[in-house]
Amino acid sequence: MKRLSFLVTMLVALMLLASCSKQQGQQLVPEDALFVMRIDAKQASEKSGLTGDKSELSKWLKKQVKAMGLDKEVRDKVLDILDDPTKSGIDLTEPLYLYAAGDLERDPDFGIVGTMASKSNLIDLIKALDVFEVEESNGVSYCELDRDAALIFNGDWFFGGKVDDVDDMIATLKERAGGKGSLDGNKAFDKMCDKKGVMQVLFLGEGLENIPNASEMTAMMPDGLDIKDFASIVDFGLNPGEAVLEAEFVPMSQEWQKYVDKSLKAMKSIDDAQTKYISDKGLSLFLNIDPKMFLEQISNLAEAYEIDDESMEMIEDVLENFDGTASLEFSGIKDNQPSVSLYVGTKNEDALGLLLQNIGDMDEFQEVGDNQYLFPTDYDYDWESEDFSRTPTAWAALGFKNGMTYFSTDKESVFSTPREKYPVKEIKGKGLYLRFNADLFDTLAKEASGSDKQLFDALSDLFDYAECYNGEGATGVMRIVMKDKKKNPVEAIADYVKKFLD
């Protein structure tokens, strides 16, 4: 058991200490894959400060190996591998690919594939560890790891995962290596392999055909679109001072391409004027879309989503009055109430009228101006009175003014201009922009206590802000920016935790 635990530890160490520069082994991913993860182990370990001559992780692992009481031959071999991971036999200087394929409900197929550095080195390592027995079949070596799992390898590649019959799997792997039944050459897969982040994840619609309710999912899409013809790629990168996650939609048919192109045209650039009443000190959101095109998209989905005529008519009434712009701010907690303001560009007061018609009891509404109202959101109760009378203590605002239908839980903040102008350069050219400023953690910490306060303080110390927005083409981007601009998030968090533990 000690040797088995050590083997797992060693393999994790190898992944962390390895590099990744070439594009080998990707032909072993099956063509019916639903999900593929590609790992650039070297970049991940280097950017998290886990490798190098002064690597604390490497020193720690070597210390653990020496303390395990292993035979000298095994101990020396493992120490050599920690210095040079290729001596394990597995070439972790190339990408690793993890995948899920097949019928995920009845007969799922999972595996990890990659490239070999030396078949003999891997065999020597397995024999030295004395955990599994190496066997041969058709010129390929294998170890049965469990009743239905095996490690299969030759001088060029390796596979680890679910195996029903070793000989059948060997034949299948040889075919994939030759290009038959491989995902290699797939447009989306090749695009993923060209990404530069530390890790990528690919979702393939073609694989989704094998999951339950796939036909129902296609039926809920606009006419002419099929679930099998879409793919998406998520690319995760680490840079000094930030982590970046980019999600890209990859059309796999002309119909999907036309749909995406049309959808992108519905996005318009956020107007600087939308930021006038919004502060960047908390959570802020901006949107600018073409309302006519947006309504057309909803109309195309009405039947699939069973939107009845009455509801569709109400949606049309709202969107016909909508000019496409919206701005939202959450600035914290004030008097135990969330401080939220929303401004929606509308052509006239009709949208307000529609809201008032459906709001219910308006007895406590106070009209404070033309199309401007206040209504209570919190009360003090007189529990000694006969009818438990109540007195409003907090008011929200709702109305139409300056070409906008607005709502705010803080009546004092409506149409007030922040002390500092919003950093408009951050939103230039974007149609959707969401920003979370870590200053909000300071605000929340003032209202918190105990462990909650400690958490908010820690988050405020580490993070500067996070933002999400539509990027180039059919992409969405999320950036997490740290206070320390020299360290990436993994390094910064690791240093913070170490300081806390010390």
Descriptions of predicted regions:
Residues 8-16:
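Bacterial N-terminal signal peptides
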Residues 20-146, 183-229, 233-235, 241-337, ...:
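Structural boundary/hinge residues at secondary-structure and domain interfaces
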Residues 144-176, 384-421, 427, 461-479:
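A short, solvent-exposed beta-edge/loop patch
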Residues 411-502:
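Long, C-terminal catalytic modules of enzymes
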